[in-house]
Regions:
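ATP-dependent carboxylate/acyl-activation modules
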Residues: 1-268
Length: 268
């Protein structure tokens, strides 16, 4: 199936160098170099480095703060009160991949006392592991989506898109296209999953901001095309609503790799 996808991709229009505002490729390369200099074997980025890399490509992220103490968590929550005054707290330690499965997330926290109790709970249960917590405002309602990148040993980076949240592994409803994406590719990618009608709505009345969603996928594609060291990226969930899209949780893994030209349509 991937061979057929690649043949169609090569037969399609040339992949344009899409004019995306706010792309800082050189800064992104510096972020990657600094990380790999410190971690020669690669690995999963810590929250601050991950957010820094995403900001190089203008990828919209929910506001957040890092806290290593109970008092810092309370101060962060005070600054970041979200929907109905609530916040979310997520534990972090190197190697933590599935926070929900590890029960390392507290939702719907109100007031200082609940924030303190949540921090103490995480600190107690993950003693010796936890290096700190991420505090975020509780996001308003929307459709939870998945966007990501994986590397194929033969074809290079693939951009993934589909239904996100806790339903990701259960429903396995996602599609993939080779990076870099064209305008045509990104439209196909959004409409390919079985759940696409949830986004497109009845009679063409979209329930999310499709233009912002396309921008997110194009920016992710650009990051994959720029950075051969990008072994894996997982944005889940991405909250999509009529007012825009926002990445609520992101994981990025880097590996040392040789640069390569991803714009292979030039060679056909």
């Amino acid at each position: 199936a991937r061979e057929l996808d690649r043949a169609r991709w090569l037969a399609g229009p040339d992949a344009p160098h899409l004019d995306l505002d706010g792309i800082e490729s050189e800064r992104a390369c510096t972020v990657v170099k600094d990380y790999l200099d410190a971690h020669p074997d690669g690995g999963w980025l810590d929250p601050r480095t991950c957010a820094d890399l995403l900001s190089c490509y203008g990828i919209p992220q929910i506001p957040w703060a890092w806290a290593e103490t109970e008092d810092d968590a309370v101060l962060a929550a005070g600054r970041l009160r979200g929907f109905d005054g609530r916040v979310v707290m997520k534990a972090h330690w190197p190697g933590l991949l599935h926070k929900t499965q590890e029960h390392a997330v507290h939702l719907d926290l109100r007031g200082d006392s609940q924030v303190r109790a949540a921090f103490r709970d995480l600190e107690t249960r993950f003693a010796g592991l936890m290096t700190g917590v991420v505090v975020q405002p509780l996001a308003a309602r929307g459709t939870e989506l998945l966007a990501g990148v994986v590397q194929d040993d033969v074809f290079g980076p693939l951009v993934l898109f589909g239904l996100g949240g806790t339903a990701t592994e259960v429903l396995a409803d996602h599609a993939a296209r080779l990076a870099p994406l064209t305008d045509h590719d990104v439209h196909e990618l959004i409409t390919a999953p079985r759940s696409a009608p949830l986004l497109l709505g009845a009679n063409g009345n979209a329930t999310v901001d499709l233009e912002d969603l396309e921008q997110l996928l194009l920016r992710l594609s650009r990051m994959a095309a720029d950075l051969p060291q990008l072994a894996e990226a997982d944005f889940n969930p991405v909250l999509a609503a009529p007012g825009g899209v926002t990445v609520l949780d992101a994981r990025v893994r880097l590996l040392p790799r040789r640069p390569q030209d991803p714009y292979l349509r030039r060679l056909r």
